Amino acid sequence: MNNLDSFDLPPNATAPPGTFVVAGLTSRDAAPELPLANTPLGELPAPERHSRPGNNCQAAMESELPVTWIQPSSVGRMSSLLELVKHVDLLQFLVRREIKVRYAQSAIGIGWAVLQPLFPMLIFTVIFGRLAKLSSDGIPYALFSFAGLVPWLYFSNGVTDGVNSLIANANMLSKVYFPRLLIPLSAVISRFIDFCVATIMLLGMMVWYGAIPNWGVCVIPWLLAMMILTTIGIACWLSTLAIQYRDVKHALSFLIQVLVYTAPVVYPTTLIPESWKLLYALNPMVGVIEGLRSALLGTRDMPWLLIAIGSVSSLVIAISGTNYFVRKQRIFADVA
């Protein structure tokens, strides 16, 4: 049995509330026959009155029958993590499936991973770089905006796919047991392929414009961890809400369009007043984008304050989001 623990109940014990007691049945017993299966409805005998679990336990012990005590397994945080580790093969399968489905029946396939960051970069360069003449920290605006788009598109696409993942896989939720967290997790991880393609394009642009990375590249692994944790946390929060309230799904595209202006994708952080900097830094993507720009393009010193505040925010978002998801996952099959 999935997610159930069973063991023999010792003599003179009483089963606590919320457990099931099966008298005279062990794991070696065959399934009982159903003699009334073909009996017409009108000829069925009157149902017997059943007592509470504790009384069933007492009656079973009085009749000297073996008693099996069945209770749900623990679903704590450590138990959930262990379940994810045990199902790592399933996670790999779901990630591969996400990637195949995304580009199935597509004329250019993985080419969309190239075009998706390229088109916004061209639009931002014309509107904000040429017309609005926003500052770009002394580097070409095309390179400046593309360096911000690469992590932002991973975040926005990962959140969008993660939010829609439970609804898209609703048929799986009621048919088989597995850690539900694997569904949004696979959607978020699968977007890392697109991120790698966009990063290769960014490196090519750096060579073209002569941008030289600095020692800050040593911080990039932590910046990527912040980006992934933030994406997973937001995806868990919103996917849990979306499967209960479909309004979240409809409002998501509008929300993503607004959020892009809360991060320094098209403008530098120097435009933000100092009195707003701490509040602004609560968005983890601010530290991620500015940190990557500093490390790869050498635009300015590493923004340690933004990274420190963003690190705390990303951890809070990830932990709270996954905890909320795990607490609510029992109702997914009912509301999907």
Each language-model region and where it sits:
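Hydrophobic transmembrane alpha-helices and immediately adjacent juxtamembrane helices
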Residues: 2-12, 19-336
